[in-house]
């Protein structure tokens, strides 16, 4: 008797990428499989059944793939948060810390209206830096984050704790220990 595959079964692990000692969790294999992708989107939507969500915000880059599909299923708009200099028009920006240095993400200054309920999505929650920056951008525009949804949580890197300390509801479809 065969068991039903879980989301985790569709995710490929690549050893020593991008650096030695890293186990890279590759979601492109999940995205490439129609059944796996459908399972992931359906499971990411499940916690929000009946909840008001006005827009989905996706973090660059794989959050765009998930966010677009989820927004379509919810019949709501999609808003990208991108690296600095990638969005045309007027934006606001937020810096955040990386392992070595800092980065900046941006959102259009008219993308979120005050009081809108937002679902923030990305493929991976590691340290929480990018997601925290995205949350700050949405809140600066007056939006309210309903929840943050991810495919993968890397709990050893502490991102969930960072987001929960900001008062966020966090959902992930699976977790992998280690780096």
UniProtKB/Swiss-Prot annotation:
- EC number(s) from the headed UniProt entry: 2.4.2.7
According to its record, what are the GO cellular component terms? cytoplasm
GO BP annotations, alphabetical order: adenine salvage; AMP salvage; purine ribonucleoside salvage
- InterPro entries in the record, alphabetically? Ade_phspho_trans, PRibTrfase_dom, PRTase-like, UPRTase/APRTase
Highest taxon in the source lineage: Bacteria
**Where is the major localization of this protein?**
cytoplasm
Q: Which Pfam families match?
A: Pribosyltran (PF00156)
The SS bond pairs are none
Catalysed reaction per UniProt?
A: AMP + diphosphate = 5-phospho-alpha-D-ribose 1-diphosphate + adenine
GO molecular function annotations of the record = adenine binding; adenine phosphoribosyltransferase activity; AMP binding
Locations listed in the record: Cytoplasm
| Pathway annotation from the record | Purine metabolism; AMP biosynthesis via salvage pathway; AMP from adenine: step 1/1
Describe, as the record does, how this protein assembles with itself and its partners.
Homodimer.
PANTHER family reported in the protein's UniProt record: ADENINE PHOSPHORIBOSYLTRANSFERASE
This chain's protein is named Adenine phosphoribosyltransferase
